[in-house]
Amino acid sequence: MSRSIKKGFFVDYHLLEKIEKANKAGAKKPIQTWSRRSTITPDFVGHTFSVHNGKAFIAVYVTENMVGHKLGEFALTRIFKAHGGMTRKEI
């Protein structure tokens, strides 16, 4: 079930402050955040975010296609290695 339209989207307040400050200064320095739950708004377009994935910060450059998605969708937390099978050594 998706979020009600009348409630609007969710963005952490501290992240909005960082965006407003960067927009006023015209800075394109990466913005470090742990807020994976924040929704990407049109104000975020053109900025680079360093989104924490639980271990490290992943650089995410925001484009127009990402608006409406969450920041955490673009910083994966799990790495798929491979299922078991024959390896080069076994051949």
Curated annotation (Swiss-Prot):
Keyword terms: Ribonucleoprotein, Ribosomal protein, RNA-binding, rRNA-binding
Citing just one GO molecular function, the answer is: rRNA binding
Xref: InterPro entries: Ribosomal_uS19, Ribosomal_uS19_bac-type, Ribosomal_uS19_CS, Ribosomal_uS19_SF
Secreted listed as a keyword: no
Q: Name a single GO biological process.
A: ribosomal small subunit assembly
Question: Quick one: a GO cellular component term?
Answer: cytoplasm
Pfam families, sorted: Ribosomal_S19
Gene3D superfamilies the record matches: 30s Ribosomal Protein S19, Chain A
Q: What does this protein do?
A: Protein S19 forms a complex with S13 that binds strongly to the 16S ribosomal RNA.
**Family, per entry:** Belongs to the universal ribosomal protein uS19 family.
- The protein depicted here goes by the name Small ribosomal subunit protein uS19
The organism named in the record is Opitutus terrae (strain DSM 11246 / JCM 15787 / PB90-1)
